């Protein structure tokens, strides 16, 4: 662009003029009217111009308002500052009018001509006083000959490019020759536009569609140096070319320009009619107006195709428009054209009916498209909908149409004439989709126009799969759908490689050769490539990376310290303190990796190692159960903990899997969050017969009546729901009794006393002399706000009652001392000496003691439903007994309370205190019984009753044992039919059941399970059924550990912990072993094979750990990188010399490829000599 083009026209009076109506002028004050008549701001800034009509009115005296209201409003709408362009009646101005018009741009000229009354005195005066101005920039007729695509609007005030307006999405809508070039008119601007690649593409597109356009624009395409030369004009020079005004895409007035017959199109006239070539170019706009009418004007500039835009903007494809003819073809509609996507938040805002409607519509669209076209890969959205998984995407831009284009638009495909025949054959050789192949040579650029000059924001061209990569990287393979790349060496050795690698999970783009090069030089990939399959007759060996003993010894200190931090839920800042403590004992600790960031990274690899082992055991388990525990952490973030109950060999395990934050606390929100978390962890929960139980905590959303169980049963029909999560049962019971007035008062009084002593160390020390247990409990419950119900803690109530006499005497002494503190103590002493309060605390101890055995039974790892039922039955009996007679603690109170005194201290007893106590006591007991019935008995599936048949203590003896439990076994087998072998025989199952009863009588349930599972050859059907029964979640020990761990980790001081770090810490704290039993070597090896350990380039070999055979094979590395099995040798491998101990972790030079690398025969890594 010429430098002068960016300049701006001088400011004129019309640019800053404000016209008022008569009614508006009357409202102004005299000072405001005088200010309106001042012309001191504009006159000194430029050359002298004609005195405007407005100031002449001020000079003559009449009021300067405008004429009629309608005429005034019409005038204001045509003002140059408004949206619409002014009207110029005639371009061929004669005489003095043309002379005066040369000093103004077309907009100004049009405006002044509209103001004139026919006498022309304004323009004449203007021209007479402004003869020194430069020659104006006006529209020249020769431009229409030089630029065949140039057209004008009806008012003759703006220029347009007919080719670019035909394809508005190709060019930025804000381009001047698309919106309307209104001046200052320069031929350089037209030349610059003619040379632009977007314009050239539009010209080629029109030429490819219509041969008449091709003939007219042949001169533009053929000579690449001068694309503007044209042998003949497209339009006549005698008449201007008209184009409908208005915003881009507004074709309402196009009908006025269209002729009534085809003959008019073929016979261009010379009387100012529209040329046939132009009308043929726009003949299909009416159909486009109908099809695109449902879209708003803002949607008109949506790109027809991402690949087309990138082809235009790609600098590497400059010659494309000159050499390659463009062919337009209507590609078949694909699913992406009619798909609508939602983000996670937007999906959560939909109700159940809207989600079901969305699922039905998407499935119907896919089925319709599948019936109309050839078979194609099933879209990921449809797969998610069929699995009833959450269909939201992670794109934060919200709902979108497929890949960014609305349905029904045409795709434009550019192909070379010379390669037309060979393209079909080459496309079969390219391991990528056709769309990706077309987009491979393209890039995109986005033009943005801000307050200043135009800025161009360029984006990189889209990356596609290249054929040359498969020759450059022999290990590179592609999936059948041709959308993902994999490393064939790494996917065959998943235990050696980090599964988070993109080329192990599936590389889906953006495809870059740098990613492949980076993967090729990684330690994990080289280890996988340098291993070969052992001969089929030799036992399989486990290959592990060989790390120097010095490196392993140094890193063990860091990983042990990091594991201790995570296991005990300590702050991450304590990591450096632990290392300093180790160093003070004489342990050699490296100077690096001593900060919080390094500790977080080590915990990450520790947790990933634990998770990998757990998930592998879960996938190998014959059946599993899912346990859900909803909670709200210290940051008030609602989340759901997911646990898995599974078999590890012959042992039942419960492990924490993840803590998923909830975006919506509804049944749909829970379901989609849980399904997404399980899918992300690659847990095959949809496999028929694999998931047998669903344990919930009984909350409103997770219960059977909440709808979540029904949603899971749609995916897993045989799922057995169990309300099993019962951690802190006593807290839940007191919470259920929270509506009772006496319970709330009791809890409030205890909190008041505790806060009174916590606020003063002096009073706390005085209390310690006679009430040591209470003083210790007050110190332990330092943060009372974190305790929901203090009255639910048996330990707190017991300490309060034991220390009650000393507490009352101390409060009496403080009250006698007087003052403000004494007044507070006097009020608390009155509460502590209340008969109602003291006796109800004794009753609460008896009440909570009944729930303790039931809570302990529910926290066992292996427990039979009969044991839970027996404990539950005893709890019902104890509660009924407590309802009618006093418990042990209450009897103790009755025995000690004599003559209105308890332990020598007088109690304030009201006349109706005993009656109120008995009423509240019975109400509390009934509420507790109702809670247990709702918690354990409501909606209880009959299969749990059938499982009681495995309680050997309830088996009959003699002949009755032969037919005992047959119906229960058959009912269980029919319900869990998917978990048993296909076509099993019920007679064979009953025979196995009879055999088990003869050998396992009087055995406890745990021994019965181990015997049945160990003898799976003898009991092939019954062992599988027994595994299902054991997997049903009855106990909740893992949920209890996870609940406590989360409260220790995310406290009020650590509310900003991310969910990723929280999951890492909980994975280690819940699933980890004791610190003294932890082996850090697997985590160190995992760290060593990832990017964090890549800086340590030690001798890169792999040590073989034989599985069965004691003989170890040697691996030899040849020049080409291939390995083969070699006979054992006695020659020792070359070992790199070691430097000083402080330089152990520095990079070492790798052995040359022609050298042989041998692993050591021993399990221990070689030391650095």
UniProtKB/Swiss-Prot annotation:
<keyword id="KW-0539">Nucleus</keyword>
<feature type="zinc finger region" description="TTF-type 2">
    <location>
        <begin position="461"/>
        <end position="544"/>
    </location>
</feature>
<feature type="domain" description="KRAB 2">
    <location>
        <begin position="333"/>
        <end position="404"/>
    </location>
</feature>
<keyword id="KW-0863">Zinc-finger</keyword>
<feature type="domain" description="KRAB 1">
    <location>
        <begin position="11"/>
        <end position="77"/>
    </location>
</feature>
<keyword id="KW-0677">Repeat</keyword>
<keyword id="KW-0805">Transcription regulation</keyword>
<dbReference type="GO" id="GO:0008270">
    <property type="term" value="F:zinc ion binding"/>
</dbReference>
<dbReference type="GO" id="GO:0046983">
    <property type="term" value="F:protein dimerization activity"/>
</dbReference>
<protein>
    <recommendedName>
        <fullName>Zinc finger protein 862</fullName>
    </recommendedName>
</protein>
<dbReference type="GO" id="GO:0006355">
    <property type="term" value="P:regulation of DNA-templated transcription"/>
</dbReference>
<dbReference type="InterPro" id="IPR012337">
    <property type="entry name" value="RNaseH-like_sf"/>
</dbReference>
<dbReference type="InterPro" id="IPR036051">
    <property type="entry name" value="KRAB_dom_sf"/>
</dbReference>
<feature type="zinc finger region" description="TTF-type 1">
    <location>
        <begin position="135"/>
        <end position="218"/>
    </location>
</feature>
<dbReference type="Pfam" id="PF05699">
    <property type="entry name" value="Dimer_Tnp_hAT"/>
</dbReference>
<keyword id="KW-0862">Zinc</keyword>
<dbReference type="InterPro" id="IPR001909">
    <property type="entry name" value="KRAB"/>
</dbReference>
<keyword id="KW-0804">Transcription</keyword>
<keyword id="KW-0479">Metal-binding</keyword>
<dbReference type="InterPro" id="IPR008906">
    <property type="entry name" value="HATC_C_dom"/>
</dbReference>
<dbReference type="InterPro" id="IPR006580">
    <property type="entry name" value="Znf_TTF"/>
</dbReference>
<dbReference type="Pfam" id="PF01352">
    <property type="entry name" value="KRAB"/>
</dbReference>
<comment type="function">
    <text>May be involved in transcriptional regulation.</text>
</comment>
<dbReference type="GO" id="GO:0005634">
    <property type="term" value="C:nucleus"/>
</dbReference>
<keyword id="KW-0225">Disease variant</keyword>
């Amino acid at each position: 662009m010429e430098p002068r083009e960016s300049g701006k026209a001088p400011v004129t009076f019309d640019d800053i003029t404000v016209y008022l109506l008569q009614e508006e002028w009357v409202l102004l004050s005299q000072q405001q009217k005088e200010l309106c008549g001042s012309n001191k701001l504009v006159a000194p800034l430029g050359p002298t111009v004609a005195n405007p009509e407005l100031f002449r009115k001020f000079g003559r005296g009449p009021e300067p308002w405008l004429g009629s209201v309608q005429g005034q409003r019409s005038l204001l709408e045509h003002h140059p500052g408004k949206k619409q362009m002014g009207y110029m009646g005639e371009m061929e101005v004669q005489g003095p009018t043309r002379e005066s018009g040369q000093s103004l741009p077309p907009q100004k000229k049009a405006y002044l001509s509209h103001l004139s009354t026919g006498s022309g005195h304004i323009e004449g005066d203007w021209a007479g006083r402004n003869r020194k101005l430069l020659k104006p920039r006006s529209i020249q007729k020769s431009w229409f000959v030089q630029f065949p695509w140039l057209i004008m609007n009806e008012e003759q005030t703006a220029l347009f490019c007919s080719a670019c307006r035909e394809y508005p999405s190709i060019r930025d809508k804000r381009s001047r020759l698309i919106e309307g070039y209104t001046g200052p008119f320069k031929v350089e601007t037209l030349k610059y536009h003619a040379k632009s690649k977007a314009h050239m593409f539009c010209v080629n597109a029109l030429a490819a569609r219509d041969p008449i356009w091709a003939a007219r624009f042949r001169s533009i395409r053929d000579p690449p140096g001068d694309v503007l030369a044209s042998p003949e004009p497209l339009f006549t020079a005698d008449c201007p070319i008209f184009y409908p005004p208005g915003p881009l895409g507004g074709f309402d007035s196009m009908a006025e320009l269209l002729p009534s017959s085809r003959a008019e199109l073929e016979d261009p006239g010379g009387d100012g009619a529209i040329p046939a070539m132009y009308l043929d170019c726009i003949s299909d706009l009416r159909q486009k107006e109908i099809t695109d009418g449902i879209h708003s004007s803002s949607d008109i500039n949506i790109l027809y195709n991402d690949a087309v835009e990138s082809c235009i903007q790609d600098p590497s494809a400059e010659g494309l428009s000159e050499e390659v003819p463009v062919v337009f073809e209507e590609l078949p509609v694909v699913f992406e054209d009619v798909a609508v996507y939602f983000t996670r938040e937007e999906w959560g805002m939909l109700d159940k009916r809207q989600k079901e409607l969305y699922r039905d519509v998407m499935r119907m669209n896919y089925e319709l498209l599948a019936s109309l076209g050839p078979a194609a890969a099933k879209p990921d959205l449809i797969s998610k909908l069929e699995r009833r998984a959450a269909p939201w995407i992670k794109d934060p831009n919200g709902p979108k149409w497929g890949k960014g284009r609305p349905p029904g638009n045409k795709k434009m495909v550019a192909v070379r004439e010379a390669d037309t025949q060979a393209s079909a054959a080459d496309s079969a050789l390219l391991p990528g989709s056709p769309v990706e192949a077309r987009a491979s040579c393209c890039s995109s650029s986005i033009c943005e126009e801000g307050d200043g000059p135009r800025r161009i924001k360029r984006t990189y061209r889209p990356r596609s799969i290249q054929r040359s990569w498969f020759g450059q990287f022999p290990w590179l393979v592609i999936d059948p759908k041709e959308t993902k790349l994999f490393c064939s060496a790494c996917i065959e050795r998943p235990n050696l490689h980090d599964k988070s690698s993109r080329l192990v999970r599936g590389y889906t783009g953006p495809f870059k050769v740098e990613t492949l090069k980076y993967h090729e030089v990684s330690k994990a990939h080289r280890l996988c490539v340098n291993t070969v399959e052992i001969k089929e007759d030799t036992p399989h060996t486990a290959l592990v990376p060989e790390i120097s003993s010095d490196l392993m010894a140094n890193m063990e200190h860091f990983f042990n310290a990091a594991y201790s931090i995570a296991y005990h839920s300590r702050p991450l800042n304590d990591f450096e303190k632990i290392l300093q403590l180790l160093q003070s004992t004489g342990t050699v600790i490296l100077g690096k990796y001593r900060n919080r960031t390094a500790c977080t990274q080590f915990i990450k690899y520790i947790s990933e190692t634990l998770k990998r082992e757990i998930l592998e055991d879960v996938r190998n388990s014959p059946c599993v159960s899912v346990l859900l525990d909803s909670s709200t952490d210290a940051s008030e973030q609602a989340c759901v903990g997911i646990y898995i109950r599974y078999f590890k060999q012959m042992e039942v395990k419960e492990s924490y899997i993840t803590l998923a934050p909830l975006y919506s606390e509804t049944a749909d929100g829970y379901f989609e969050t849980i399904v997404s978390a399980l899918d992300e962890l690659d847990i095959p929960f949809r496999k028929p017969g694999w998931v047998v139980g669903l344990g919930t905590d009984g909350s409103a959303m997770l219960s059977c009546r909440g709808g979540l169980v029904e949603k899971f049963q749609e995916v897993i029909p045989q799922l057995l729901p169990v309300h099993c999560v019962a951690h802190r049962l006593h807290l839940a019971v007191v919470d259920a009794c929270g509506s009772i007035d006496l319970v709330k008062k009791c809890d409030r009084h205890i909190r008041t006393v505790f806060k009174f002593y916590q606020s003063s160390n002096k009073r706390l020390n005085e209390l310690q002399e006679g009430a040591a247990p209470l003083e210790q409990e007050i110190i332990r419950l330092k943060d009372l706000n974190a305790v929901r119900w203090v009255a639910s803690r048996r330990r707190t109530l017991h300490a309060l009652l034991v220390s009650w006499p000393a507490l009352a005497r101390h409060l009496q002494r403080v009250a006698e001392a007087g003052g403000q503190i004494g007044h507070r103590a006097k009020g608390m002493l009155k509460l502590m000496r209340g008969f109602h309060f003291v006796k109800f605390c004794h009753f609460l101890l008896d009440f909570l003691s009944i729930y303790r055995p039931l809570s302990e039974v529910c926290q066992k790892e292996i427990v039979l439903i009969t044991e839970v039922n027996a404990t539950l039955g005893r709890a019902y009996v104890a509660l009924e007994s407590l309802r009618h007679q006093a418990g042990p603690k209450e009897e103790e109170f009755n025995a000690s309370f004599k003559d209105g005194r308890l332990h020598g201290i007088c109690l304030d007893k009201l006349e109706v205190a005993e009656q109120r106590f008995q009423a509240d006591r019975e109400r509390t007991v009934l509420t507790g019984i109702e809670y247990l019935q709702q918690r354990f008995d409501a909606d209880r599936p009959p299969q749990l009753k059938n499982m009681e048949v495995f309680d050997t203590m309830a088996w009959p003896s003699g002949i009755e044992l032969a037919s005992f439990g047959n119906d229960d076994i058959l009912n269980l087998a029919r319900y869990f039919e998917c978990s048993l072998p296909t076509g099993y025989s019920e007679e064979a199952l009953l025979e196995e059941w009879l055999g088990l009863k003869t050998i396992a009588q009087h055995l406890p349930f745990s021994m019965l399970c181990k015997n049945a599972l160990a003898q799976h050859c003898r009991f092939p059907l019954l062992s599988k059924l027994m595994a299902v029964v054991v997997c049903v979640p009855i106990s909740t020990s893992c949920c209890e550990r996870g609940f406590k761990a989360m409260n220790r980790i995310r406290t009020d001081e650590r509310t900003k912990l991310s969910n990723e770090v929280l999951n890492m810490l909980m994975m280690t704290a819940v699933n980890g072993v004791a610190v003294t039993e932890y082996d850090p070597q697997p985590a160190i090896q995992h760290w060593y094979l990832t990017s964090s350990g890549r800086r340590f380039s030690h001798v890169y070999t792999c040590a073989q750990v034989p599985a069965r055979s004691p003989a170890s094979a040697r691996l030899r590395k040849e020049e080409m990188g291939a390995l083969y099995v070699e006979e054992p040798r006695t020659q020792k491998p070359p070992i790199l010399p070691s430097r000083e101990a402080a330089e152990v972790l520095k990079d070492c030079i790798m052995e040359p490829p022609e050298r042989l690398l041998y692993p050591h025969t021993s399990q221990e890594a070689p030391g650095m000599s």
